[in-house]
């Protein structure tokens, strides 16, 4: 496995807009530089403007086993987010299905026609900057839908600071304030529980 702390602003996969500067391109360059001929296999994915832990499998077996753990909800993912406003409920669970928004290939929304999505959260800290109330929130995903944390936080009235798709532009940060700081899973070969932490330095 290759474990990377992805900076914000870098997509995991190549696209028309980021054909040569994706994280996968960087991993290929690294593999080539050490003479490792491997297919690029990201296990988990993060949005371009989300920072944090991304894991790449070095062979098909590891990729398959880790993907199976994720599908069985045995691959625990935890995040830190800074959200708009102060939460009335300091901890809770958001259970609201998510679907693709009509007429959009990118945006998602809460919809009764969507797939099950469950997000657990607890507020770590509340603070104000220049009259703007914000909350630092610890988030644990039970499911892994596209944009799940961003959609759910906006749904309860606390969009992530800097999230221009589901909230508003921020004067304090030029990206969404969301960081994947911890993953926990059982190694498919050793059977040992791995707990990987990556602090948010911003």
Spans of model-derived segments:
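Short aromatic-glycine motifs in intrinsically disordered, low-complexity regions
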Residues: 104-112
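Short small-residue beta-strand/loop micro-motif enriched in glycine and branched aliphatics
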Residues: 10-13, 106-107, 135
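A short beta-strand motif that forms part of the nucleic acid-binding face
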Residues: 8, 16, 59-60, 70-74, ...
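Generic recognition of long tandem-repeat/solenoid scaffolds
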Residues: 4, 94, 108, 135-137
């Amino acid at each position: 496995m290759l474990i990377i702390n992805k900076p914000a602003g870098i997509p995991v996969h190549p696209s028309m807009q980021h054909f040569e500067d994706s994280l996968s391109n960087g991993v290929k360059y690294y593999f080539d530089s050490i003479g490792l001929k491997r297919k690029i296999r990201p296990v988990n994915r993060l949005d371009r403007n989300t920072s944090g832990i991304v894991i790449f499998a070095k062979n098909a077996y590891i990729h398959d086993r880790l993907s199976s753990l994720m599908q069985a909800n045995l691959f625990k993912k935890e995040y830190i987010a800074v959200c708009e406003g102060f939460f009335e409920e300091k901890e809770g669970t958001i259970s609201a299905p998510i679907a693709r928004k009509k007429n959009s290939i990118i945006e998602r929304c809460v919809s009764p026609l969507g797939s099950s999505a469950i997000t657990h959260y607890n507020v770590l800290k509340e603070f104000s900057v220049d009259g703007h109330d914000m909350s630092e929130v610890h988030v644990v995903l039970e499911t892994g839908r596209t944009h799940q944390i961003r959609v759910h936080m906006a749904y309860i009235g606390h969009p992530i600071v800097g999230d221009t798709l589901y909230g508003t532009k921020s004067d304090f940060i030029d990206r969404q304030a969301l960081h994947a700081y911890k993953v926990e899973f059982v190694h498919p070969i050793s059977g040992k529980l791995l707990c990987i932490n990556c602090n948010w330095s911003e």
